[in-house]
Structure formats: C-alpha cells, structure tokens
Design a protein with these regions (language model features):
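Short His-centered aromatic/hydrophobic patch
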Residues: 1-6, 25
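Short glycine/serine-rich donor-binding loops of glycosyltransferases
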Residues: 10, 195-198
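A short, active-site helix/loop in glycosyltransferases that binds the activated sugar's phosphate group
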Residues: 50-88
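A short helix/loop element that forms part of the nucleotide-sugar donor recognition site in Leloir-type
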Residues: 88-103
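A conserved mid-protein helix/loop that constitutes part of the nucleotide-sugar donor-binding site
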Residues: 108-137, 148-154, 196
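Nucleotide-activated donor-binding/catalytic signature segment of Leloir-type glycosyltransferases, i.e.
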Residues: 154-170
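Aromatic "clamp/platform" in nucleotide-sugar-dependent glycosyltransferases that forms part
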Residues: 171, 190
Length: 203
C-alpha cells in the first residue's frame, strides 16, 4: 500500500484470516485534500489490521506509521535497490542518444524522469531551466515520461519561450541510456519516499 487511503485490502485480509498482513510505505505525503483526509482518518485504524510495517525510507515510515511506531522499532526499512551496472555512465550511450535527439556533444543537457503530475513539480523544472537558458543558450531540457499535465507544461514552456529547447520523449523503456546523455538531473518533487528514478540517476 502507498497510503492509509488503501486500508480496505488490509481489513479484508485480516477478516479472511490472513496471518501476515503487511503495510508498506513508499511515499512521504499524499496528494489532494480528500486523500489527506482519508489518510488522517485511516492511519490510526491501520494498526488493528497490520502485523508487519515496512518502509522504503525513514521519512516514509514516519509519515505512514507515525513517530512512535518508528521509535519503538516497529517499522522495518527496506531500501529500494537498482542494478547499478545497468545504470552506470556509458560514453557510447551518451553519444548515441544525443545524436538521436539532435543535441550537440558539447551542449548542456538538463534532464528529468517522471510522470507529468503535480507531485513531480514540472513547473519548478521549467523555472530552473529558464534561468539556465539565459546563461547557456545552447542548453537543452530532456523530459522523459507522460501524464495528464504534459500538455499544460508544454503550454507553459511555450509562453516562457523555451518550448523549442525542450525534448519530450514520452515513456522510454531504456531510461538508462538517456541518463548517460544528461549533465544535470533535476528532481524537485513536492514529496517522495525513496524514488527509484533518483537512485538510477545517481548510479
């Protein structure tokens, strides 16, 4: 589960006699007022249905299960893991992806990987890139992903006069190749647990 809003499966599992009912926190906040209210109501009730509590980070654990549960040692941290060899830097991938995207070898490439939704804060990415563009006119922004706010972000980029400097790749199955083509990775999310994307970018 990602938040206390998903309490129904936990209750049903307990009612069905499941001996091990596990809750896992993979985030550190919840989007929207309704979701926040549901979390506030359900979080105290969750302890009646759960045997084991897991979280991908301390912040995520404290957010879903509370400080007291964390301090009592009731929360087990299981950090997200990636194949570091797969995401390591590749000069070959850097060259090929830049050629594919029509980016020169010496241009500064700023990148981001994430769904176009409020949580990922693409508006901040645009503001930052706009400032970078003023100092580095040849800079390019590579945005990997899709989502309901994509057209809105494209419109904002157009108004800011940087749309022609941005590459929208859509969803990619070979993200690791694109990461090698980037010089700077932006990740200004409003909230996260321990995002795989950030781990991959640092590999």
């Amino acid at each position: 589960m990602l938040s206390a809003a998903n309490i129904v499966p936990l209750r049903l599992a307990k009612q069905a006699g499941v001996r091990k009912v596990i809750a896992h926190s993979h985030n550190a906040s919840a989007p929207g007022i309704v979701r926040k209210l549901m979390d506030g109501v359900n979080r105290p009730r969750m302890k009646h249905y759960v045997n084991e509590k897991f979280a991908c980070s301390e912040k995520a654990g404290r957010w879903l299960f509370g400080d007291k549960a964390f301090e009592r040692g009731e929360v087990t941290l299981v950090a997200n893991a990636i194949e570091t060899d797969k995401y390591g830097f590749s000069e070959s991938n850097r060259r090929k992806i830049r050629e594919k995207l029509g980016i020169s070898g010496d241009a500064l490439v700023v990148g981001h990987v994430g769904r176009f939704q409020v949580q990922k804060n693409h508006e901040a990415i645009l503001r930052i890139f706009h400032e970078i563009q003023r100092k580095e006119p040849a800079a390019r922004l590579c945005l990997i992903g899709d989502g309901e706010l994509k057209e809105q972000i494209q419109e904002q980029a157009k108004k800011a006069g940087v749309l022609d400097k941005i590459i929208f790749t859509g969803v990619c199955q070979d993200v690791e190749r694109y990461l090698s083509a980037m010089d700077v990775f932006l990740f200004p999310s409003l909230f996260e647990g321990l995002p795989f994307t950030l781990l991959e970018a640092q590999a």
